[in-house]
Amino acid sequence: MAIKVLSPQLANQIAAGEVVERPASVVKELVENSLDAGATRIQIDIENGGSTLIRIRDNGIGIAKDELSLALARHATSKIASLDDLDNILSLGFRGEALASISSVSRLTLTSRPATQNEAWQVYAQGREMETTLQPASHPVGTTVEVANLFFNTPARRKFLRTDKTEFAHIDEVIRRIALAKMAISFTLTHNGKIVRQYRSAHDRTQKLKRVAAICGDEFVQNALEIDWKHDDLHLSGWVAQPTFSRTQNDLSYCYINGRMVRDKIITHAIRQAYADFLSPEQYPAFVLFIDLNPNDVDVNVHPTKHEVRFHQQRLVHDFICQGISNALHSEQASLYQTNEACVSANYQVEESAQHEYRPSYSKPNRAAAGQNIFDSSTTTPSTALFQTNKKNTQNRPHFSTNIPATRISKTEQAAYSALLSNSEMATVLPQEDGALLERKTPSILKALALVENKALLLQQQQQFYLLSLQQLQRLKIELSLQRDPVLQQPLLIPIVFRLNPQQLTYWQQQKTFFTQIGFEFHENLGQQRITLNRVPSCLRQQNLQKCIIVLLSQPLDTFSHFLTTLCDVIELEQITVYADAVTLLTETEQLLNQKQAIRLSELFIELNWQAYLEKM
């Protein structure tokens, strides 16, 4: 077959295959047009699930008479005019494809009147030919679009439509999503002449919470934590549900970029990562999130239905979202919103800047992002329970090197291993003479045999065997790293701002030299009782820095050793599940030891006595 240029009619029907998937797609495109036209009231009338009639009526600016026919032409739009406009899109629509695509698979009537005209005009088009008829009509300022007999000329598409109930459920979900994003707009949705949804315009907090409750349910609002998180041009706001309000299906997840509803993999991953410590893979978080950023930093022209976007700085956006949600989830003082309340619980001081409020929060392990997170924990007593996380059940299985046969551990060794795990203090090897102790410090005569239940290394030195706790080994490595001269530092991508209460300020004056000594770099603003964290020790880069600092500043630590011990107790340790990683940890720790510190490693060894076991053989 020879190559030919497709006719406009065929091209429009092909485009309709991308834009018009089902009646809900038509509703989405037309309601977004109404929003772009500045409408404050939008009515959506549906008959028979949208297959018979879809009518969208708004009070927007309207379309002039001489532009009505042009509005149905393909690639005709008032929203962009140049390539520069394409890089700076804030409108919901911009391609000029929707009306042309819809009219090519339906009988479409467009009636409109701008405020500058005394009378309204109506244009009608149907099917493949798309010939338009213009005539006067009676209509208030605004626009009405009627789409009748959807897919009447494409039977193959029409037979794929589901039942009226199913198709209307999809339309209802589209309106719910749009209504969450556009709180100031009133929406009325009818089906077969009956009002199904009616969302009044919401301007203050009480009204907005009522709309969220109407769409997401009262239980969501009662378990929701508010987020208001800013950094430069990035702004994250909305509500996230507490982990206890998890879902078995992904039915309460609403995310918007500059007011546009999206389903983006980067955002989804960031949200899942923020909830990783709280939810299992079978559980889903519930959230309503609004992300606002410079339109130049996001490309919305990457998907036929505009459901996906592409960020120019994906890592920054990912970390910013993850950090903001983590802060809310980890904050003991996060506010629970009640359906009959319009304000958050006043358990803490709120930092106000311009017209935004910043919520107190703690972060999960630093994802290379933090924002203007300003808080005051004057009413909080440090508690270890605050920082506990749900550990996932893992299958504990010993890992052995390839050249070492697997052997069964006797009850004697199991008892010694249990003692190692139950003892939170550093274990000391007592029945050793100085010569043997010094000999054991030599790395060359130590052999790492196996990883035992992902918690300890089984070591051999000549005829002696030892268990070495991986948790204690990790703490020792971090402690040694913080005592290096100089300490390796890394700058924070987004500085963390702390607002201190008087008690914390006192402890800060006491401990700030200790912070500097181990590689932290703060900027002080004592007049406003603020400190800003700018640089951190490299070994703590992935730690929950806010949690660590709050714990340190909540108690008197008058000596450096006490300060360092407290910090090492707070840090979150990595779960090591691979034998090679455990050996690497041991090697890196040994490299940090100097001659005076060599005994520190030996003190962690628990000797295993095989003699009683061997005598029974």
Swiss-Prot record:
Top-level division of the source organism's lineage: Bacteria
Coiled-coil stretches: none
Entry annotated with the keyword DNA repair: yes
Biological-process GO terms, alphabetical: mismatch repair
Pfam families according to UniProt: DNA_mis_repair (PF01119), HATPase_c_3 (PF13589), MutL_C (PF08676)
SMART domains for this protein: DNA_mis_repair, MutL_C
Classification via Gene3D superfamilies: 3.30.230.10, Histidine kinase-like ATPase, C-terminal domain (3.30.565.10), MutL, C-terminal domain, dimerisation subdomain (3.30.1540.20), MutL, C-terminal domain, regulatory subdomain (3.30.1370.100)
Keyword annotations: DNA damage, DNA repair
UniProt function note: This protein is involved in the repair of mismatches in DNA. It is required for dam-dependent methyl-directed DNA mismatch repair. May act as a 'molecular matchmaker', a protein that promotes the formation of a stable complex between two or more DNA-binding proteins in an ATP-dependent manner without itself being part of a final effector complex.
Similarity-based family: Belongs to the DNA mismatch repair MutL/HexB family.
Name this protein carries in UniProt: DNA mismatch repair protein MutL
